[in-house]
Amino acid sequence: MKTQQVVFRVRVFFASVALLVLGIVLLEPGACAQTPTPIAPPSAPRPVQDPGQQLIDQQREATRQRRLAEPPAQISVAPQGGGTSLNIPLDTPVDQIPEPGPTFRVRQIVLTGPGGQPLVRTVVSQSTLDAITAAFTGHDIGSHRLNVLLQRLTNAYVSAGYVTTRAVLGPQNIGAGMLTVVIQMGRIEAFMVNGKPIHRLATNEPSAGGGRLTDAGYQNAFPSGPGDSLRLSDIDQGVAQINRLRRNQASVQVLPGQTVGDSVVAISNPPGDRTYYTLGVDNYGAQSTGVTRYQAGVEADNLIGLQESLSLNYIDSIESNALVGSFAIPWGRHTFSYTLSDSEYQQVIGTTALEYGRTLSHIFGWNYQLGRTQSDLTALDATFTWRRTDRELNNLDLDPQREAVLRVGGNWLHRFALNDAQGNITLDAGLSQGLPWFGAKHDGADAPRTDAHAQFTKFDATVAWTVPLPRLGRAAIAYRGALGGQYTNVALYGNDQLYLGGMDTIRGFRSGDIAGDRGFYLRNELAWVNVPVWHDGRIEPYMFLDAGRAERVAVPGFSTLAGVGAGLRAQWQWHSQQFSGEAMVGRQLVRPAAIGPKSTLALGTINWSF
């Protein structure tokens, strides 16, 4: 009976999602008519998504997936002196705390730093400290109650992440009834990597941490350095920055230093390979530029020793190709990056015209981690993109498109437990502004909204989630979804538009079947996530229902795509090599008549990483 109830709930849940997608479909003008509203005249060229931007989007999604799969940082703290074995609830009245020895009346409790210095400001609020000391003020205190006070003050700092900070007794004036407590802030004395101090390497000196010139990147990855207060969240952030590279699996042990209160941050990280390679093939490409696509990539991690990453990726189809190079380096809570993309395509328009385009993009990025806990991660990011697109029509040069775009946004990750499994939700949102500087094309003062703009304001947002559902017997089922889109009030150039269709938006269609200045999409998936492992191979069957709508400002009216189907993901690990693939069959439910009749599409990819 219980299994039947679970099955019924899953069916009702997926039926609700289907009704939501159906609602999107029915909003399409003429969706039930014989001839749906076309997105463009049949003779108009099909939208071509920049293959370089596709590669960049794939890398961002891969980064998001690695972040979701990132295990908690392994941090251990050696026992510190100054603690007690007392454990009395905070709300216990002082007079009820046993006091076997002599006592004295306390009229005032003063908290200071070492040597009478002012108390270091931390995330532990003054009101929290006052609440602890107020409970003891005006009472008789002996050694037992005094230890309780010190423990409670210490616990306030430890619970805030200052795991090596201790409250100790300072110089006393008992006769005046004043008790002085010194807050001995735990500080970082030094960093070590695999048992050796961090330093610039001499010629031919072997590296302890994998860098060729230095191991300074390990220390630079932490928000705090020698002499700073030691806080667990800062250590966690540093470990996460180090482990963002594929070759690293770092853990940290906080060891006592030479001076009381100081600690050595000992990093253990047997580094893996410096370089990784990827080869792949798929049939995700657009009909106009080539269905079959070949990909190759190389990634080099921490070559210099600054925890930097360098990657080079290439994608090629019969009528398009792109080369994308990326570099990123961390500095505490900051991560700076630069991406260079060079891509080109050509397509036949009608039967007489050949269109050729080439896009060169420079992207400068910055990310700042606002906060990190076991369950939440919050960050700010900004990117500046300079882009030039040159086009030809039958070997005649068209007006080049030059853009300078600044995007400022934020993202949030939340992990949670449900039905004895881990779920998550991610949110990414940003505001883009086209700038009139750096050689960008200037829009005319009287340019109509229907003309493509280089100076524009655009809002985009994407929320994605994984929700573990009740088990079906032994099978663990997860519902994965995503809702994304963008909005602007003026026409955009192709590189700034929203493309719908393909494995990253609406499955059952080829990449970028329709494009619009504004629109949205909804992805829904039910996946069996605990299929038994066979010979180190894993598979994941799933079924999906996706839909989305896009509109061009110059052509009023939304166009709709909707698809349904099923697929299978597979992964096999053999020593240091990994093989992965995916096969999917999708049926098109709704599509504009201008891009052809509805059809059933089979897509697949296979990749080899080593």
For the regions a protein language model found, what residue spans apply to each?
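C-terminal transmembrane beta-barrel domains of outer membrane proteins
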Residues: 34, 133, 447-610
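Transmembrane beta-barrel strands of outer-membrane/channel proteins
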Residues: 254, 279-283, 296, 310-316, ...
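Gram-negative outer-membrane beta-barrel proteins
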Residues: 285-289, 304, 318-320, 344-350, ...
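Bacterial N-terminal signal peptides
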Residues: 15-26
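Outer-membrane beta-barrel domain signature
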Residues: 143, 228-229, 283-287, 311-316, ...
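Gram-negative/organellar outer-membrane beta-barrel architecture
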Residues: 35-41, 207-219, 231-417, 597-609
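Periplasmic polypeptide-binding modules associated with outer-membrane biogenesis and secretion
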Residues: 34-285, 297, 313-322, 482-483
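Short loop/turn motifs that connect adjacent beta-strands in outer-membrane beta-barrel proteins
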Residues: 273, 303-309, 333-335, 371-379, ...
